[in-house]
């Protein structure tokens, strides 16, 4: 046999042995997570914005599972808070006004000042910023959660947080609050 074939066979056998060892170790030392934490995390919006006072949605889910309040997630809003309260078996509370943003704001990039460094793109947890290296960037306002994480990394300070204008598209319509009268159809004779 040539030296190359022997080397390939030896490396293949080593790879198989190490693969089996790693597979065994992964099963033997597997850490089981809290299923309640997983359920709570599934309900959270996964923006990783930190507005709740925790560094991301997973740490906040762990805190809720350990007894923290369920009303600290502004991006999730009242609907998420009610689902969390139902899951935890507690009474729904209004969103914590010290944590919640009163007026929804979104990031706005002054494109004429943008140098295209991509630091804001890397900081955005919901991929709401478009752009590429050395080119201007822009924000997709429909995706922006207003978490403010893109402002600090900007080296030229060209990102502003502006309130969302109230239009028919952004208005919080409460259609269930409008009474609807059901009309009975006349049957043909």
Curated annotation (Swiss-Prot):
Transmembrane segments: none annotated. [4Fe-4S] cluster 3 binds at residues 124, 144, 147, 150. [4Fe-4S] cluster 1 binds at residues 49, 52, 57, 73. Residues 1-26 are annotated as: Hydrophobic. It is found in: Cell inner membrane. Residues 105-134, 135-164 form the 4Fe-4S ferredoxin-type domain. [4Fe-4S] cluster 2 binds at residues 114, 117, 120, 154. It holds the Pfam family Fer4_21. One of its GO terms (biological process) is electron transport chain. Keywords: 4Fe-4S, Cell inner membrane, Cell membrane, Electron transport, Iron, Iron-sulfur, Membrane, Metal-binding, Repeat, Translocase, Transport. The keyword Iron-sulfur applies. It comes from the Bacteria. This is Ion-translocating oxidoreductase complex subunit B.
